């Protein structure tokens, strides 16, 4: 036997290297085979519900790192709630209708207009489902736990029927109407867009300053006067039917020396405009308030058949332009509102593809709207005063990335204005985890217009509306419920397979159809109505869920998307928000803080992370960032997170190794019988338990990460485990001192494994497989630990807080001695302490081997004053010298009692007593050489 064999060197097969990329799929298959999700649900039956409703990602392509962050966050919450006394099911969902899938099929060569519509929709469905299953596998690879066999998909018959019923209730309440209002129109998609489907980019446009000649000045302006107008959309002049001024803005009538014409502009802008137009010696002839100009009539710049009326509008400002805007009610919301109020014609001169129509005039017909500037300039002639290129923020179609226009077309709308206050009141009852989130959603609802819910596409849920022979729209409770029932059985494709009459209830009649003939609507619903109905299609329809949900968790872009549409439909139907809490997340940026883009080549695919680091590192990264704001991710950042993971893993490996001979049923030492330092570590750990439990409850993942890493680095590695080897390696295997420390080790190991499970389930299960005395076969089936408090807890904490200050001072003294070459390692030191009474009392209260705690070979507490050369602090001073004696081959301390023993061992008296008591046979035979 060798002397080193008398040490209790921790042994474990738990590997230092995690091998996550190869091991994770093996564990995941084991969980699936063991039906862990179902077993967890069974354990939680009868417990209070906590329902996190999954916002459905769009089923197209593999998941990106933003998806991963969002879904890992959801998984952490679901797992922590499931282990905290809640029935927390997770039903994953997917959004499957809409233009992107049509675009994919088009790229694959599918020609929609050349094939049967039902066959086309079948192709859309097949593609969408293939993407659902692809993404499902992506999410499962992240280690997510959920009901993967009973997911929800917006294209299933039961879901589509539930969506129709949401629409039906809104129709019954009078919230659905048809109107020809200007809407965001995407010529690239040939469809109307909702606000949630647009994004803003900078765009360079040609702006024109031109003049309309007064035709009837109403006794205020002469007919040789021109009103100066500014526009950034020259094509809309073809549909201009008025000029709008601000009622309270001052306008001036001016005569430039170089002009025979007189002009009207906003007084505040005269100087800048004169410079722009090259006007010199400008004479101000008169000043008018905007309201005085109301109902003056001007000529259209070139269309002699059209007069343009001066009207008043609150949207006119003097921030730019001329303080006067031309008004084309068919091409803008403000224009429409003031135009309708003043009886202006709603002219639309651009078709669905962005091509100018015949009513724009022969010179414009057939041109693309954005290419007509030269023709407009030619038509304006000397009415054009200036032109310039401007860069401004402009709306784009979020899918095609092409600019859009406002365009008045007949559309179906869901009224928001009719119950806006009810929606705002519902927002006040929701808990937002960021105050700005509440403000953002509140302001969006307060300021938004009615919702355009019709789309001129094929792949989606049909609007369940019929038309009588006289054109009357039919959407009664009876007809809508009948359609819902048909969809429930056959799916929405039945709408296209049958004619209108066979989609209506048997024997249905309507006074507007004396011949019994009907037509059906061919528009489909906005996809935001699809996902916005999920509270009904999922929460209401599934017996193991609750409505409203406890939590909606999505990216911050969903304040104008899913949070918004779900809120409107839910309040419209039931008067309540579909969620009790909203938690939002920022976007994922690259390591430099730049937006991720395939074109920039700075994206990170979750699959690449899984291959290089493992999903566990991605999961740990999610907790290491403040996801309420935009967050950065790169392979370098993940490499740093991987180092943190390695530290966590190796610390827990040390605990596993050094409790391998510990049986909690036999070897646990009661708290009251622990040493003071062990009590301190037990209390500190339970403070960590409370911090983590509270943070899980509040979804504060970063708090968990910081607290955990700090505890491992500061409390364990830098202190408790730093001197632990002197106890667990050196002392007798069954000694009280060793069992005391092992009791703390085991308690921390078991509980920290449970606390880590929601974040690092793969690693937690790997650790759990080494804990043979724990009852549950999987840690995921256990409960999170409860924090304990102990008698005299504050007193113990105060004592050890003071000791940590003392320890820091001692370490400074040792460092000075090391720099002076007095010692090398701290174990070479004999530390003499010159304490005042406070420190002396402290060291007595610590009631531990202080030399061991400071990792020095010898320590003396001296009486009297410290020598002049001592390293002094306010309450204590230290001197450091090299310890006397020889290095013990067993404990490595320098000790005066170290000597060669008769059994061929050079060891100190303390080690000799341990060896002689526990290894009599080796002592009798003598130890082998090293």
Swiss-Prot record:
Subcellular localization(s) per the UniProt record: Cytoplasm
Annotated positions binding Zn(2+): 888, 891, 908, 911
Cofactor binding description: Binds 1 zinc ion per subunit.
InterPro entries noted in UniProt: aa-tRNA-synth_I_CS, aa-tRNA-synth_Ia, Anticodon_Ile_BEm, Ile-tRNA-ligase, Ile-tRNA-ligase_type1, Ile-tRNA_ligase, M/V/L/I-tRNA-synth_anticd-bd, Rossmann-like_a/b/a_fold
Top-level enzyme category: ligase
CDD domains referenced in this protein's UniProt entry, alphabetically: Anticodon_Ia_Ile_BEm, IleRS_core
Statement: the UniProt record of this protein carries the keyword Cytoplasm: yes
Sequence positions that bind L-isoleucyl-5'-AMP: 554
GO molecular function: aminoacyl-tRNA deacylase activity; ATP binding; isoleucine-tRNA ligase activity; tRNA binding; zinc ion binding
Motif segment ('HIGH' region): 57-67
Cofactor(s) listed in the protein's UniProt record: Zn(2+)
GO CC term (a single one): cytosol
Gene3D superfamilies: 1.10.730.20, HUPs, Ile-tRNA synthetase CP2 domain-like, Valyl/Leucyl/Isoleucyl-tRNA synthetase, editing domain
Assigned keywords, A-Z: Aminoacyl-tRNA synthetase, ATP-binding, Cytoplasm, Ligase, Metal-binding, Nucleotide-binding, Protein biosynthesis, Zinc
Domain notes: IleRS has two distinct active sites: one for aminoacylation and one for editing. The misactivated valine is translocated from the active site to the editing site, which sterically excludes the correctly activated isoleucine. The single editing site contains two valyl binding pockets, one specific for each substrate (Val-AMP or Val-tRNA(Ile)).
Purpose: Catalyzes the attachment of isoleucine to tRNA(Ile). As IleRS can inadvertently accommodate and process structurally similar amino acids such as valine, to avoid such errors it has two additional distinct tRNA(Ile)-dependent editing activities. One activity is designated as 'pretransfer' editing and involves the hydrolysis of activated Val-AMP. The other activity is designated 'posttransfer' editing and involves deacylation of mischarged Val-tRNA(Ile).
Listed NCBIfam families: ileS
Descriptive protein name: Isoleucine--tRNA ligase
